[in-house]
Amino acid sequence: MKKFILLIIALFYTVVAYAQGTDQVSAILQHGDTETIFIGNTGFAQAYEAAVDGDVIILSQGIFNTINNISKVLTIYGAGFEDNAETNTATTTINGTVRLGDGSDTEFDGIHIEGVKINGYMGLNSQLKNVTIQRCCITNNVELNHNTENVTFRQCYMLGDILGQYKHANGLLISNCYVSKNINNFSVNSFVHIDHSYMGNMYSRVYREYAQFLWTNSIINKLSGDLPLGYAAIVKNCIFFADNYYNDVDLENCYRLNSVADIFADGENADYSPTRTFELKDPETYVGTDGTPIGLSGGAGWNKVPSNPYVSKVNATLSGTQLNVTYEAGVNK
């Protein structure tokens, strides 16, 4: 109910902007039972400055300026990381690098970011714990610049590398993510789990061999160099398109196909597009450890709509001094 109240507030400002012929963006700060709205591209920064640990920030569609770092335990929702014809929603963009933490050894436990396009790098810069980045697009590298524990990326579109920066990652989970490039550079005894994901280009890099990698239910496109999956990696129910798995890798129920186009129902290669669902051509043949199809369509599925309520259709008309508004709203699970 609280989220729907915030939705109505956001809707109010949307239609006011519509009536005024402007294209405003807004950020709503929820602190307990109090909601405060901030208008304009600096709205996110203003909401952040006013927030305390445990608060929620809801960003409208549109472009927001980034901030120096996020060093408060907040939940941040956007409208989605790309325009969506099905829900009739547009993109929420944070323009610039997003840094979680302030570079100190301070522990930040429970940050959640969902439904946002981050137009730049993402840096994990403090001792982060139980952090979830969900249904987001990150246009450049993700860099783990500090030791972390139980960090999850779920249903994200990641255009750059995931770089461990020689730090210790205790329980890094990449789940139902499309990763265009590589994941590497983790310190001794790190544990990294890639599940129901697409990995674009795995190539060997120093220090990966010292981390424990668990690969499950994933599609791995390109492999090159020495130990591209990690030394003594465990690999279960994955699909490859090359046979250079290399030594000291434990393969279980894996498949090798000749071409990426052989696996997807649409017969296309692995290139990303907003309309693709990455359904498998033979989902009953290529089954994961959990009984669902290997790849993005299995597990939690390839779902890009954030879990906060969204306005799918707005119709605002002026009749004299009266503003008449009709709208449709929905919520994702």
Residues covered by each model-derived region:
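Right-handed parallel beta-helix/beta-spiral solenoid domain characteristic of secreted/periplasmic
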Residues: 74-122, 161
